[in-house]
Curated annotation (Swiss-Prot):
Its main location: nucleus. It is found in: Nucleus. Pfam families: DNA_pol_A_exo1. The gene is WRNexo. It comes from Drosophila simulans (Fruit fly). Residues 149-314 form the 3'-5' exonuclease domain. GO terms for biological process: negative regulation of mitotic recombination; nucleobase-containing compound metabolic process. The keyword Nuclease applies. Residues 59-70 have a biased composition (Basic residues). This is 3'-5' exonuclease. GO terms for cellular component: nucleus.
């Protein structure tokens, strides 16, 4: 019988761990539970004493000295959290290395360069006459007067600033051509409102097609195309062939690039600012009569166009003269070399400085 009996291992009392101590080691520190129906106040007290291993021990000291205050585990330590954040995201150090520009400024003792502020230009002030017409017969009479004035001029070319206005709606798009403004003399601008005009007067068509008249403006070709769509008595192609786009002409004379708006061209050539108020620009140009702001806006557009034309004409003459004088003194090879370096010859150059 003994061989069929298995010997059961006898547990040593020395290896036994008290139940309460084992539970205390495994359990994490916890907040005392709320009393339930099954727990008695005495049992709750025993459980708190058994599981609360994080309670700080009282330090030995003089009798009567209060024990250290217990930390609230539920409230995070703000100081520790700040230190942890600084360790994760250390503050960026400013590089002490000097670049080429900062080194030169440090040696010279000059302050660091500031961002250039845009130059404040004075606004255009037009003090000339504004002749405003709304009826077809009045427009015809005015255009005929200008036509006679053009024919009396001795010059072969009579520059005339030309511009148009029309209403625009984001729902319906651009409306019909409503205003034509012209300027042949900086002292007078003509504004023709076409709301009541079903067909352009013959005198106005003859004026803009006159062989001596050179119409000019910014993006003027698109104006002629729109005018021809709205009024079939106008043919766009002959007007486009003889007109002058001031932006393209500026690129040729000043050797600049890109597309120009009238506002930017005014800043660059005339050193003036334009008040391109959206309230006026997007206003109801077909409504009669135009108010003072609309009349001034329309007049300034062609007035400044005439000013820009005269200035570009003057610069072109200076440029041609300087180029010819330079070629005579230094030869074609030197002239080509200077052009390669980006010289515009808008100012006089006597000798080659390569």
């Amino acid at each position: 019988m003994e061989r069929f009996l298995t010997k059961m291992p006898i547990k040593s009392k020395a290896n036994e761990v008290p139940k309460k101590e084992a539970v205390a080691k495994k359990e994490t520190p916890k907040v005392a539970r709320k009393a339930t129906k099954k727990d008695t106040p005495k049992e709750l007290k025993d459980k708190e004493n058994a599981g609360d291993d994080n309670t700080p021990k009282q330090t030995k000291g003089r009798p009567g000295r209060p024990a250290a205050k217990r930390k609230n585990l539920d409230t995070p330590d703000v100081k520790d959290e700040k230190i942890a954040m600084e360790e994760e995201n250390p503050p960026k150090r400013r590089s002490s290395r000097l670049t080429r520009s900062t080194r030169s400024m440090a040696e010279d003792g000059s302050p660091s360069p500031e961002k250039e502020k845009p130059e404040k230009l004075p606004f255009i002030k037009y003090k000339g006459a504004i002749k405003y017409f709304t009826e077809s017969q009045d427009i015809a009479a005015s255009a005929d007067d200008v036509l006679q004035w053009v024919e009396k001029q001795k010059d072969d070319v009579v520059p005339m600033a030309f511009d148009m206005e029309w209403p625009f709606s984001f729902q319906t798009g651009p409306g019909k051509s409503s205003v034509i403004q012209i300027c042949v003399d900086e002292k007078c601008c003509y504004i023709y409102q076409l709301t009541n005009v079903k067909k352009l007067p013959a005198a106005l068509v003859a004026l803009i097609n006159h062989p001596k008249v050179r119409l000019h403006g910014v993006n003027i070709k698109n104006d002629f195309r729109k005018l021809a769509r709205d009024f079939p008595e106008v043919t766009a192609e002959p007007l486009i062939e003889k007109c002058v786009d001031l932006g393209l002409w500026c690129n040729e004379v000043c050797e600049t690039g890109g597309r120009w708006s009238l506002e930017r061209l005014t800043n660059f050539i005339a050193k003036k600012a334009m008040d391109k108020s959206k309230k006026v620009r997007m206003s109801k140009w077909h409504v009669i009569p135009l108010d003072e702001n609309q009349l001034m806006y329309a007049a300034i557009d062609v007035y400044i166009g005439q000013v820009i034309y005269r200035e570009l004409e003057r610069r072109e003459k200076v440029k041609i003269k300087n180029e010819e004088e330079f070629k005579e003194k230094n030869g074609d090879a030197a002239f080509k070399a200077m052009k390669t370096l980006g010289e515009t010859f808008l100012t006089k150059i006597n000798e080659v400085t390569l």
